């Protein structure tokens, strides 16, 4: 079985003044359908850079990032946008909702981009799945941080993507709300056999993943699985 996500010898560097800083060096990894992988590492080690590459928001200097066998860097911008809407779900620490859109409009955006005529109905179902049927017409400013993160999870999963990329999704929430949000994310990924790539510092969440990898010196090292 071919991996759903494959990273092959990726390098990424940034210019800082007169210096070129290597962030990722010949990094490789893969993930199978339904697999949950925790990515660990200290602040500034390149975890966010890696997620940006996985999401097709940035391109590697060297190497390839493939989703369902397709190289993201070789796609047109329109094709990458469509891939992000259809095959990738993204949940950030900051939920990044459109403040001028209601919950149902935010959740329906990926489907609207894909031209799905039933996007409103599917967005409504996704909000029901995260326990927010009563918030469909509310704006982000009218909801709590935990509710907004639930909306972000609903948006990430509404198109039934192959992979969800999550960057410390409970990091800005209190412990109880964070635990509820993560339980929801794990449960929905299990239900739909969705691959989860989770950047986290939480040891308990790491234990729930099939594998744990630590990003060190620009490369990934296995610490579990």
Task: Please place each PLM-identified region on the residue numbering.
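Short hydrophobic/aromatic patches at helix-to-coil boundaries
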Residues: 114, 223-225
């Amino acid at each position: 079985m071919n991996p759903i996500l494959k990273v092959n010898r990726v390098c990424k560097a940034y210019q800082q003044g007169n210096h070129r800083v290597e962030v990722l060096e010949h990094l490789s990894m893969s993930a199978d359908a339904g697999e949950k992988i925790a990515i660990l590492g200290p602040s500034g080690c390149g975890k966010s850079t890696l997620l940006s590459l996985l999401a097709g928001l940035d391109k590697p200097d060297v190497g390839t990032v493939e989703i369902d066998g397709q190289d993201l860097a070789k796609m047109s911008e329109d094709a990458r946008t469509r891939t992000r809407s259809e095959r990738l779900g993204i949940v950030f620490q900051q939920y990044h909702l459109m403040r001028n859109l209601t919950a149902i409009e935010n959740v329906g955006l990926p489907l609207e981009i894909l031209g799905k005529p039933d996007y409103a109905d599917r967005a409504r179902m996704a909000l029901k799945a995260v326990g927010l049927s009563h918030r469909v017409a509310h704006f982000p400013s009218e909801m709590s941080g935990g509710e907004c993160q639930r909306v972000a999870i609903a948006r990430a999963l509404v198109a039934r993507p192959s992979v969800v990329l999550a960057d410390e999704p409970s990091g800005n929430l209190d412990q109880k709300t964070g635990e509820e949000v993560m339980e929801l994310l794990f449960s929905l990924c299990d239900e739909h056999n969705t691959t989860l790539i989770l950047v986290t510092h939480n040891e308990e969440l790491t234990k729930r993943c099939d594998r744990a990898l630590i990003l060190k010196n620009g490369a990934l090292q296995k610490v579990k699985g």
